[in-house]
Structure formats: structure tokens, C-alpha cells
Amino acid sequence: MVESQFHSTTICAVEKDGKFAMAGDGQVTMGESVVMKGTAKKVRRIYNDEVVVGFAGSVADAFTLEEKFEGKLNEYNGNLTRAAVELAQEWRTQQSMQKLEAMLIVMNKEEMLLVSGTGEVITPDDGILAIGSGGNFALSAARAMKNFGDKEMPAKEIAKNALNIAADICVFTNHNIIVEEL
């Protein structure tokens, strides 16, 4: 039996030298074995191009959360932290939202946050966040490059290279990578 859920991806966000970059792959997988699309755009700019959001998980759920997050950004005049906290609280307390299976990374030119359905809003200690099926691979690769690699490598290249490494390892991640930088 094939599940009707569409999911799996890898998103990686990196801050270095005051620059923020987020990379995501384009693979949409149905169930555990069927690649339905290889060119999905799961990293995008919102709020007058001032905020970048990346999502992993069930595609329909992720779109719902992205839309709700953008609504919160508008409601709180672009205050990223406030919008993220309000979304997380709503996600946790509204019964209709509790079943949503997705995670978000959101960032502007000042900060990045991970927003989860369990109510967490997490700021990274080291300027790196990664989510999705290949998230741990991308996180490890990005940390290695940022901490031990070429000191001149910018955030954009670290995020992209981390996604490429994750795509080499994770069957739910492909090499069709989109990168957004602030």
C-alpha cells in the first residue's frame, strides 16, 4: 500500500559574517518509494522579500504553515520572533493545526529560527539550522565547513555544499538545489 502523503526534503540555513543563506532541494516523495517531483521550490522569499522561509514535511501541511506564518508576519509588522512564537503557540493549541506534519526554518537579515509543531522556536547557537530527512547530514556538513573548512567560504556556499552532501547520502533529497541569501 502506498501512502498518499507527500513529504521528505532537506533544508539548511547558515549565518556567517553577517550574511544569511538558506538552501533546499526540490524532491517531493510520495510514501517511502516514489519520487513525484524533482523541482519543487521549498525555499522562498515572503514579506516583501525581507524574509526567507524553508519547509520540510508534508507538502500540503508545509504550505498551510507558510501561509499562516506570513499572516503572522503581517499581523506583527515583520517581527520575525513574535510571528514565529505566535505561530508555534497556535500550532500547539489549535486542534486543527496539531495534526500538521511539517517544520519551518525562517530567517531575515538579523536572525534565523526553527519553528516546530511541538511549540518550539529555536535559535541556533552556531548559526546553522537544518531540517528534513537529510537534515542531520546537512547540519553536520555545514558545521564542518563553517568551523574547519575554508574560512573564506560564504554562507551561501556552505548551505549549498551542505545540501549537496545530504543529497549524496539521503534518498529523499536531490541535487536540484535552490539557495536564497539575505
From Swiss-Prot:
The keyword Protease applies. Belongs to the peptidase T1B family. HslV subfamily. GO terms for molecular function: metal ion binding; threonine-type endopeptidase activity. Keywords: Allosteric enzyme, Cytoplasm, Hydrolase, Metal-binding, Protease, Sodium, Threonine protease. Protease subunit of a proteasome-like degradation complex believed to be a general protein degrading machinery. The gene is hslV. GO terms for biological process: proteolysis involved in protein catabolic process. Allosterically activated by HslU binding. Its EC number is 3.4.25.2. GO terms for cellular component: HslUV protease complex; proteasome core complex. Its main location: cytoplasm. A double ring-shaped homohexamer of HslV is capped on each side by a ring-shaped HslU homohexamer. The assembly of the HslU/HslV complex is dependent on binding of ATP. This is ATP-dependent protease subunit HslV. It is found in: Cytoplasm. The active site is at 9. Na(+) binds at residues 167, 170, 173. The keyword Hydrolase applies. It comes from the Bacteria. It catalyses: ATP-dependent cleavage of peptide bonds with broad specificity.
